[in-house]
Amino acid sequence: MRITLFSVLVTAFCLSITAPVALSAPPDANPFFAPYGTPFETPPFQRIGPEHYMPAFQKAMEEQKNEVRAITMVRSVPTFENTIVALDRSGRLLQRVSGVFGILRGAITTDQLDSIAVIFTPLLTAHRNDIALNEQLFQRIKAVYDKRATLSLTPEQSMLLDNTYKDFVRGGANLSPADKQRLRVINDELSMLSLKFNQNLLKETNSYRLVVEKKEDLDGLPPDAIDAGAEAARNAKLDGKWVFTLQKPSWIPFLQYAKNRGLRETLYRAYCNRGDNNNAFDNKQISARIAALRVARANLLGYPTHAAYVLEENMAKTPAAVYEFLNRLWEPALQVAQKERDAMQAMINTEAKPFPLASWDWWYYAEKVKKAEYDLDEDALRPYFKMENVRQGAFDVASQLYGLQFLERKDIPTYAGDVQVFEVKGRDGAHIGILYTDYYLRGGKRPGAWMGELRSFGRIGDSVVTPVVYNVGNFSGPAAGKPALLSLDEVETLFHEFGHALSGLLSQRSYDNLGLPRDGIELPSQIMENWALHPDVLRSYARHYATGEPIPDALIQKIVRSGKFNQGFITVEYLAASLLDLDWHTLADTTLRATNAFEQTTFNRIRLMPEIVSRYRSPYFAHIFSGGYSAGY
């Protein structure tokens, strides 16, 4: 997943709890208000404290307001330079502060940062509304846009002008004063609901733990998974027990290997019921209200549905085109998944006490079928996927494809001890940018994996601003005297997010508002992910962590042969989530739906197998209800 600087401005404030927070610091002591004085002007994380954000955000918003006011006060005729470019270059301090705040809120949050997020969610929304609905500013933009045919603009300039004009029109600039006020109210409520949705989801995810007291209940689990459970128990002051959580490196191995079917069910139900427990953190009403407000906003802006509004600017263009594409994939995927289910059921039927396959059995029996059909035990592959070797493999692919060099820089500050920083150079040795890698689980880090930008490439006159990007993951770190050893899925995730990082590092544009369509940003990551398990690439980086021996060709062939194994399941769970997303966002009225009944209607319509749960259910579908992927997952 890619997080841009723009989306940081929109969503960095979405998770929160109340706690005391230092509101201010002496202006001359605020690191945001002066050059950092670090290599490549990277953030001096060790000098930035919670007390610096409030005054920095306040000053940054005021600074951008003044920049916008200056544009509207220009007495000369609106031009591309004095209006469009000036607006594009406004808000640099806000980008600077938001970039740092965003990476910390995602990767290593604290109660103080959460409190700042609570305060600034409505303030930032109001600030964005003030710019988007500024009548004087829009009239200047429109004046330039209306004479675009006479301006002899470059392709980049034309795209910036088009994007700027469309953003304002789509943001409500043409609405009446009364409708603009209604739009403000909708945007304000949506921002707070998104905040609450994410808050609830994190609470549900991070507070749950399955405590195992008997060692026999761990039968089947690999030693590394047992050790990780014991360490989690010690951290929870439950020595002598084992703790498993809803973090992916914990629950996935448990479902893959634990023989105890009852505990598999308990853990998987907890995962699938996040936000759906009728408690203080329930997200059902929130998701329904978000969907209804999006319909209201779309209607206000002249669109029949939220999906029509979103997709107009994406490559897909229309909801009908997306439905056609997804439905074309659905039936073949469902047929493959049914065959996979039948193979697992056949295996269960040979056991002493057979039973119907359930969703919490899928990972366990898929692993057994893979072992039987391909003689491949995924856990036995981990010793060949030491994190540092996998990352170097990704670097080497980028070196061969694009001539890049990656040099670790220990002189650049980080925000946590296990974060590493690399300077990226071109074939000629010229500086291209900076990459932070932050791969391991830690308290305060949100689930998942993502790429983001602290600074994007830009040109100001003859000066070039080089990018600073980061990759964040949630892999299990070094433990029990062993380095971090990745699963196949984590290997592909590392390559995937690195593809996003390469996009951020290598994209060159003269203006900020020239990003890719939302449904186009996944292409670089998919290209890079494709190389992760290529035989030639595997031979280059997959080496046993203890002996240094390269992965045997026999194992590579097993990986290749099993490459399409379980793809029916994977495709069905993804497509089910995509279709659920589209069903929510093709609603044409503001009636509040009963969330569980609504999604069940979707799953019944597409005939989703009961043995497979959608990749995301509505109460924890953060991509669409608090992220930037609504009508686009």
Across the structure, where does each feature detected by a protein language model lie?
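N-terminal helix-rich structural modules
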Residues: 10, 25-222, 632
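Short His/Asp/Glu-rich catalytic/ion-coordination signatures at enzyme active sites or charged loops
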Residues: 37-52, 101-120, 143-185, 245-285, ...
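C-terminal substrate/ligand-recognition segments
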Residues: 491, 495, 568-586, 609, ...
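Short pre-active-site segment immediately N-terminal to the catalytic Zn-binding motif
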Residues: 476-495
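Bacterial N-terminal signal peptides
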Residues: 7-18
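Catalytic Zn2+-binding segment of zinc metalloproteases
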Residues: 304, 499-511
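Active-site-proximal, well-structured secondary-structure segments within enzyme catalytic domains
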Residues: 160, 184, 189-192, 199, ...
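Active-site recognition of the HExxH zinc-binding catalytic motif
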Residues: 489-504, 525
